C-alpha cells in the first residue's frame, strides 16, 4: 500500500498565507512523488483557495471537522454536504484536540465516523492515550475502546475509506515523540484489534503515526513495522519541511 502523508494545519494560515504556501510547495523541484498519497487539512476558509491551486495536482483536500447532520439549526457547524460542495473528499475525526479541548464524546465521534463513511468520504480516525492513561498502564484498553466505539458495525464496503492515526496525546505539539518501541507496540496492537473486529480486509487499512513528526524523525518512523504513513501538524506549515517529510523514507 502507498504511504499516506496527511497535513493538519489546525487553526493556522489565512487564505493568502495558505495560497503562498501551496504555490511554494508546488513550485519546488522535488515534486510530489507517485509513491506517496498526500492529504491536506487546511482551515475551512482556505479550502476553496487551495483547491484551485491544486487542480492539476495529486494532492487532495480534507476538512478538520464537520457536524453529523445534513443541515439544520446547528450554529457554527459545517455539514458533509457543504464540504462536498467545495471539493473535500476526506475528513479528520477524533483528533485529540477535539476530544480533550472541544470536549467531543465517543458517541459523537461514532456518529461522525459512520455518517462520513456513508457519504463516501475517506476518513482519518485519530486515537491515542493521555499521559495519565499511559502512566496507569491503560494504553491497550484505551486504544481498543476508542476503536470499538467508533468502528463497530461499519459496512465492509467502507473499509477502503478508513485510515487510523495513532497520536499519543502527550506527544501532540509538545516536541515529545513516542519511542520507536512505543510506536511499534501501539501500531501492532491497533492492527490486531482491527483484525479481530473486521477480519482479513483490515490489512488494507493504513495506520499513521502522529505526534511531533518533523523532517528529522519522519524517515525513522516510516521504517517501523505497521507504520503506513504520518499525520503531521506544525511541520506541515512550511513548504520546505513538509516536502522533506513527503520524500522521507525512500530514495528516488
UniProtKB/Swiss-Prot annotation:
One of its GO terms (cellular component) is cytosol. It holds the Pfam family TIM. GO terms for biological process: gluconeogenesis; glyceraldehyde-3-phosphate biosynthetic process; glycerol catabolic process; glycolytic process. Involved in the gluconeogenesis. Catalyzes stereospecifically the conversion of dihydroxyacetone phosphate (DHAP) to D-glyceraldehyde-3-phosphate (G3P). Homodimer. Belongs to the triosephosphate isomerase family. Its EC number is 5.3.1.1. The active site is at 95 (electrophile), 167 (proton acceptor). This is Triosephosphate isomerase. Pathway: Carbohydrate biosynthesis; gluconeogenesis; Carbohydrate degradation; glycolysis; D-glyceraldehyde 3-phosphate from glycerone phosphate: step 1/1. Substrate binds at residues 8-10, 173, 212, 233-234. Coiled coil: none annotated. One of its GO terms (molecular function) is triose-phosphate isomerase activity. It catalyses: D-glyceraldehyde 3-phosphate = dihydroxyacetone phosphate. The gene is tpiA. It comes from Lawsonia intracellularis (strain PHE/MN1-00). It is found in: Cytoplasm.
